[in-house]
């Protein structure tokens, strides 16, 4: 069975793993998933990630982060999806929780946070919100 939305699958795996206090979570890898994981690591939402396996079937392993026994990621939700893509210009990129969370945006200059996109003066597809 083909997966219609691999990014939503990635976010759901992270959410489910944190609900049962898993240390790591694995999923099929792609360049976009690795870029999203890199943004999550830069922002301090995960401890790290690693691409494992063969080139034919790479696996992305994410090490989750907890603080005082609770997951660091309180909320992670998909915004743009295959049935309804959400694109925002550089002046319309949304803030999450008045700047306490991040929106992950896919731009022509790569995957970045809403703050970096505004600083670089680029818009793009709003992939997800993380808080």
UniProtKB/Swiss-Prot annotation:
Question: Which GO molecular function entries does the Swiss-Prot or TrEMBL record give?
Answer: rRNA binding; structural constituent of ribosome
Q: Pfam families, alphabetically?
A: Ribosomal_S8 (PF00410)
Among the GO biological process terms of this entry, one is: translation
What Gene Ontology cellular component terms go with this record? ribonucleoprotein complex; ribosome
From the record, what ranges are coiled-coil?
none
Q: What SUPFAM superfamilies does its record include?
A: Ribosomal protein S8
What's in the keyword line of the UniProt record? Ribonucleoprotein, Ribosomal protein, RNA-binding, rRNA-binding
PANTHER family (UniProt xref): 40S RIBOSOMAL PROTEIN S15A (PTHR11758)
Subunit comment: Part of the 30S ribosomal subunit. Contacts proteins S5 and S12.
Question: Which family does the record claim for this protein?
Answer: Belongs to the universal ribosomal protein uS8 family.
Q: What does the protein in this record do?
A: One of the primary rRNA binding proteins, it binds directly to 16S rRNA central domain where it helps coordinate assembly of the platform of the 30S subunit.
Protein's recorded name: Small ribosomal subunit protein uS8
Organism listed in the record: Bordetella petrii (strain ATCC BAA-461 / DSM 12804 / CCUG 43448)
